[in-house]
Structures are given as C-alpha cells and as structure tokens.
Amino acid sequence: MPFLPGKMPKPAVCRRPATSFHADLAGGSRYLYWKHNATPSPHPRRPRVFRVQGDTAMDWQGLRFLGESPVDGYVLQNCTYSPSLVALAFLVACLAGYTALDMVERVGNSLSHPRLWQWIGAFCLGSGIWATHFVAMLAFHAPIALRYDLPITGLSLLIAVAASYLTMYMTARPRFGLLPCLLAACCIGLGIAAMHYTGMAAMRSVATQYYQPSLFALSVLIAIGAAFTALAAVPYLRGRRSARYRYMKLIASLLLAGAIAAMHFTGMAALVLSVPAGTPLELQASADSLRLGWLTGVLASAIAACGIWAAWSEKQRERRLSENSRVNALLNQLDHAHASLRQMARYDSLTGLQNRTAFNEVFVQHLENCRLRGKGLAVMFLDLDHFKRINDSLGHDSGDQLLKIVSERIRSVLRDSDVVARFAGDEFCVLADLTQDHEAHILSQRLMQKMKEPIALDGRTLVMTASVGVSLYPNDGEQCEELLKNAGLALHQSKACGRNNAQFFSRQLLVRATQELQMEEELRQALRDDQLELHYQPILALADGEVHQLEALVRWRHPTQGLLGPDRFIGLAEANGMIDQLDDWVLRRACRDLRSLHLAGHERLRVAVNCCASNLGRASLVDEVRHALEQAGLAACFLELEVTEDALMYNIDQTIPLLERLRELGVSLSIDDFGTGYSSLAYLRRLPLDALKVDRSFIMDIPASQRDMEIAQAIIAMAQKLHLKVVAEGVETPQQLAFLRENHCELVQGYLFSRPLPLAALEEFLRAYRFDAAPPLRSLNQA
C-alpha cells in the first residue's frame, strides 16, 4: 500500500472462476480473502467496498472512502487482535479519561495557573488517545507486513493533543451548559476520529485501504455520543465532595475511554484491505508488536499517572494553601477583633473620647512629663447639671446626641496637647498642662461658658450648665489617684454649692470627705448593731389639749460624738444607699413602740413616720408597711406617713397610685414641711392626703414677721378648703400658739410643749401630762 500521494499500482488479474473463496493456511494462517475477477457481469451486484480504479475514488494517502468494490485483488477479512494489547489499550484510554477529568476539575478549581493545567490535561488526554490507537493497532494482526510513517504518526498525535486542548478550553468555562457540552463533545469526538484516520493513513503495506461509509459515519457518531455522555458529568465534578463524587468520576472516565475505544474498533470494522493478486500472504511475527505495544501502553499509563499525581499534588498544595488562608483569615479576624476590642476597651463608643482605662495610661505619661519639665498640670472633672432630666423627658437617644455635642464643645476649647475623656454618663475629665495655676481658672470658666451656648436638639433649644471640680499638680497631689480623688471632691463641692460653678480642691474638702467616709462606715455599723433609737415629739389638739399623735424622729447615739440628730446622717444615708434600710427600721420600731404605748393605756395615740423620696419609687413599700403593722399587731388607722413636697413631685404619676394603695390599706398621709418645696395645686387636689404640716420656718418669726403670718394664714385656709387637717410645727412661744388658735389650726407641736423624747421619757411625759392639763393650753383657754 503506497503512503505518499501518487499513482496506485494496478492490481494483477487472475484467470479464475468468477467468484471463489480461498484459504491460505500456510504457516497456520486463518486469514480469509475474497477474489474478484475482471470479467464484467451483465447483472453486477451492489458493491460492498470502494472501487480502486478510476478518477471517481476519493484518494488521500492511499485511503479510499468513496467508490466501487476493488477489482482483480484480494479483500482481507477476519484479521485478529491480541487480547492483552486490546485490554492494555482500553486501560490506557481509561487512565487518559480519568486524568483528563481530573485536569478539568483542576482547571475549574485551581487557585493558580489554570492555563497550565489545560495544557497538561490536553497532553495527557491527547497522548492517551493516541497511545490507545497505537497500542490497538499493534494488537491488529494481518497476513501482510505493516509499517508506519513517522511524520504522519506524529501528526496524528498533534491532532489528538489539539482536539484535547480545545475540549479542555471549552470545559473550563464557568457555566458549562448543554450547548457548550455538545460543542466540546463534537470537538473531542471529531478529534478522536481525525486522529484515528490520520493514524490509519500512516500505516504502510502492500494492501489498499477501503472504508465502509456506514461504519465510518457510525464510528464518528459513537465518539461524539460517548464523549457527550462523559462530559455531561463535568459540572458535577467541580466543588463536589459527596459520597457519589468518586463513582461519578470513574463512570465518566469509563465513558470517555469507551468513546475512544468504540470509535477505534468501529473504525477498524469499517476498514477493508485489498492486496494485489499473487501477493504472498503469511502471518507476521507478533512478538515485536507485542513488546512495542506494551512499551507504548506503559509509557502512556506513566504519563497519565504523572498527570494524576500532579493533580493530586496540586490538590494537596491548594488544600494546604486553603487551610493556611483559612488560618490566616481567622488570624486576621482575631487581629481585627483584638483591635476592635482594644478600641472598645480604650475609647468611648458614643463620643469617640478616651475612656477611663486609656485616660489612666495617658495620665501617667503626662504626669511624668510634667514632673521632668517642672510644669504644672490641672485635672478637671466636668459634670452636666440635670442631665438625667434630659434623658427622662426627651429620651436616651436625645441624651446621647447631647453628649456628642458636649464632647465636641469640650474638644473645641482645649488645646492639642490637652486630653479629654468620658468617664461615665455625663462626667468628663480633662488634663491640661499649666505654666501658672491661674490658667486652670481661665480654662474652667471657658468650659463653663461654652456649655451655656444654646443647643438645638429635637426641635428644642436647650441651655446646659456644668459643674467643674479642679485639682492641681503638684499643689494638690503628686500621684494620679490622689489628683483624681481630689478633683472628684472639688466636683462634689461644686454640686453642693448649687451647681453651675467651678470649685478648686482645698484641704478642708479632704478633711470633710474623710469624716463623711468614716461616718458612712459607722452608720452601717450602727444599723447592724442597733445603735439607732427613736424619739417622739407629741402633737396636741388645740380643741381639747389632748396628745392625739406622735412624730417619730430618728436619733443616732454615736459612740464618740453622742446623740446625733437626723440632719447629721440622713443625707449621708441617702447618698450611700442606706436610706431604704433606715426607713424600714424606723417604720418597724415606731409601730412596735406605739403598740407598747397602747398596751400601757394610751389607746388613742397615733404615730407619724417620715417617708423619703426613694421609698415612694418602690412598689414594695405597701407590702413593707403591711408587714410592719402585722408584725407589731397594730391597726393601719394608727399609722400616718409623712412625705415632703419634693418627694411627691419627683415622680407624681407613679406616686399617686402608690399613695392610693396606702390609703386603701388604712394608712393616713400628710405633706411634711409644706411650703418649702415646689408643688402644684392641680396635683395637690388629686393626692389622697389627710393633713398638711406647716413648716417651722413660717412659724418661728411669728408675730414679728407679718409676711410669715400671712403665709401661715393662707396655708391654713387652703387646707381647710381642701378638707385637710393642719399641723403647725415649731411652736415655741405662747404668741405663736395664740395666732394659730385664732386661725383655727387644729394640731400643734413644738418645744413649747415638749422636745422629742425617747420612749421611756415619753411614757413619763404622758403620765404627767394627763394630770397636769397642759399649762400653756390652760392659760390660753383662761385668757
């Protein structure tokens, strides 16, 4: 068979019967051949193969695809194959298909060099297709000598690699749908066919090759169809690690190998070899072909194995990179979280100012710098006046907005070297370097003046004031803690002086603070050790002169300072959260003492107990009163609770329901120190009250003060119009008593009748009073 273009040799003509079969059994050959003579037949049968002679034949490299049956020659049939090489060829195809799918997966998932993996996959698949063809051709045994043209064989390899690359390129698309899959299947299917028939063109022998058109077309369709089925699994191989992943990949590789093998052997089934007449036919030695086939198969398998190993190594590398990236991402997140936590730990999230933690660190550095340079330093506490009222009335969002505005204003006043921090709520702290002490006074005034500028907030215009406390280094301390403490004492003094002012630390403040701290500790100890006691001041009725009621007044018998009045420790108890415990003790002790007086024969006596503002904010007050009465065995009608105007007005909407519950319990209610606080007559008529107590400040200057007399008269008249009893406090002279009697005041108390007395002295007073008939009242009645 000629391989290069040119004129084909004319087959020899044999003079034999029209048609006959011959078996050449020389050397044990089982090859059959079919002879045609040159005598034309009047009824020619339909040709089974392609015609050799004539210009109508399609001739390329000695291959005939179209034409009539060959004449005057032999057609070789029933050529055999080496089973081991056929199996090896299929194994090579499987490895090539598996490697190609592995590369497809790499191209889709690779983090780097996807084009390189396309070329590696194309070479592995193309060389595998070519090796499958070549090993299968070496497995082909024909009774003629066969050899292969090297350039054309190399061309078939290039065709296989090129088709494989185009297929790899198509499958690398992110969206590999039905149409791209069909195009890729056509590409690889046609590439396999082109490689096969180009490789067949490289085969050289005395025979002429003919192809049956139907089988030829079927081989191409089989290659495309099987490739399409295999490539349809590509989308499922990307990013999938399910239980069926490996099975799907194996099945797809078998389908791709089947496409290669099916195309090859279908193409071989379409092949018909025709030899010239008289050509000797003998079985060729197959040992060399077998060795060459195995060598080729092993090399191709090694190439595929290297591709699989490379893909596996890349997977491991990318897995390590992915793990490292994940770890690095976690570390970055941790760093970011650490930075965020550090930011949150050092800076106020609302205003962006430093918080106490960061301020303390900066304070140490500032103080050390001032110490080295010999300069002064001012520590200022700034607290907004009545900020809680803003939160309660406008809401916390408005309060937060106000704090942002205030922080910006403080920044605008300070220098770049100064430091400002937000400690808590509406409290700010400033560090300012000083050359002279009077600069601190100037700065504090500038801060206070800046705070007074109008603020537009939620459609309102607000004017805020601030209290400032200042301590100076080195005059007021040389340590951070000491300077902060002293500035806090100065701020406390500023609030005590009416707010909206600046106070500088002095040693007297420290002495007072030390005393208050000691008093606080001793008061707690007094509550635990029962060092408190109640004194009772009688309240008399002007109508009959009888003692109708007692006011319970707490006293503290201090171990070193003696008997202390409530003005010495009530404020301390309120400031340190002990007032609730103190009021509860007074209530229980007063109920118990009154019960003992009832048992002593004073059954009509009632007792009045003071109730602080914080107690009116507790819903448990009613239960505490009920428990104290039950524990003492006392009826509720004998108890009266006294509250101040300020306590009532502090939270009037919550106070009114609480007072109504106390009235339902049977407890009487009165307003203590009436006229000294702020109240509204509209609220006064809504309150469930029984009595008003005129403060002693309106009684003490009667009759010298005409204004006080008019105020007292107005209060008494108003109470009578509201059907409330009136109790006048601080009655100390007969003139005051006469004035109250003339204005129809019902009840009086004061030093004119008795000082507050302990229980034992009170019992003596009641016994003596019963028989003495109250000299002041008796003389007044006689007059």
Curated annotation (Swiss-Prot):
Any single GO CC term annotated in Swiss-Prot or TrEMBL for this entry: plasma membrane
Catalytic activity: 3',3'-c-di-GMP + H2O = 5'-phosphoguanylyl(3'->5')guanosine + H(+)
Residues in GGDEF domain copies: 375-507
Domain EAL: 516-770
Cell inner membrane found in the keyword field: yes
Membrane topology: Multi-pass membrane protein
Gene induction: Expression is induced in response to nitric oxide (NO). Is probably only weakly expressed under normal conditions.
Cofactor binding mode and count: Binds 2 Mg(2+) ions per subunit.
Topology, Cytoplasmic side: 313-783
Domain MHYT: residue ranges: 81-274
EC number(s) per entry: 3.1.4.52
Essential cofactor(s): Mg(2+)
Summary of activators and inhibitors of this protein: PDE activity is stimulated by GTP. It could also be stimulated by NO.
Transmembrane annotation, as ranges: 84-104, 120-140, 150-170, 176-196, 215-235, 255-275, 292-312
Disruption phenotype: Inactivation of the gene impairs biofilm dispersion upon exposure to NO but not dispersion in response to glutamate. Disruption of the gene does not cause a biofilm-related phenotype under standard conditions. Mutants exhibit an intermediate virulence phenotype.
Positions annotated to bind Mg(2+) 1: 551, 610, 642, 672
Keyword list, A-Z: c-di-GMP, Cell inner membrane, Cell membrane, Hydrolase, Magnesium, Membrane, Metal-binding, Transmembrane, Transmembrane helix
Residues engaged in binding 3',3'-c-di-GMP: 537, 551, 555, 610, 615, 672, 696, 732, 751
Binding site for Mg(2+) 2: 672-673, 729
Coiled coil: none
Molecular-function GO terms, alphabetical: cyclic-guanylate-specific phosphodiesterase activity; metal ion binding
Role description: Displays c-di-GMP-specific phosphodiesterase (PDE) activity. Seems to play a specific role in nitric oxide (NO)-induced biofilm dispersion. Enhanced NbdA synthesis in the presence of NO increases PDE activity, leading to reduced cellular c-di-GMP levels and biofilm dispersion. Does not show diguanylate cyclase (DGC) activity.
Entry domain remark: The N-terminal MHYT domain might sense NO through a bound metal ion.
Xref: NCBIfam families: GGDEF
Protein name: Cyclic di-GMP phosphodiesterase NbdA
Gene this protein is translated from: nbdA
